[in-house]
């Protein structure tokens, strides 16, 4: 950035601050609630692997977030997970500027605008364990900037697009790049039907990875059904294309008991082919290494019931059974085998 540009930015900043000061002097102070809001999610569960006869208790999520408004147009959010599979992770850290109701600009770390299921927070999930799309194939948080715009053409159309480092929050100190990752998402919110299309480009190594996702959600009364498909392509044929699918249905049944407010039976089918995270492994002085299979091809059928002790997604007990089907030669990770899951989720 040259001196002329820097000087212009400083002058614009001074003018903005002067205008704001004059506004307050004229008695036009904004009626803004600046009290920070503290929210959190705790997910604790017991899992029993039916084939191995082994079980475990786990605190899967212990998230705490602080969000609020600085002015009518400026807001912020910071969220941390104190126990993401035993690790402390910074999740969100961003400032959002919304000059009017249809336009917003966000800068910082956030979940990039891509897919349906990966964008659900833990308290908004329908099942105890996420789909393959949300967990392995399309799950990305990164540092960058994003623009969102909403149209109303008889129904809302929401478009979000952004550019991102590719470094994540923890690796950004000495991270410099000549290129950027990008992600874009369009939501068509028809009555009772949501159509979502999204695309993303990442570059974990010298191999660029392009992803394309499409999904439809149907909701009517207490019934919801959703299907989502993701296609992943690696440049230079570094790895074969990846396909992933997720489909589920859920029906809410209100009940009148002192403890349980709603019972929701649900079923899911998801699938993914052999998958690489895009990073090279087994590098030597003479070889860059190669992309490997990080997740083997598998199908999964999940069935269960959710007991809501309050409003939906506030205090839920999720009881699931997961049945896995691996391809011949596929290696199952320790936590991805046939199992019964009982999870308690609390949102505050």
Residue ranges and their predicted role:
Residues 50-52, 71, 96-98, 118-120, ...:
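Outer-membrane beta-barrel pore domains
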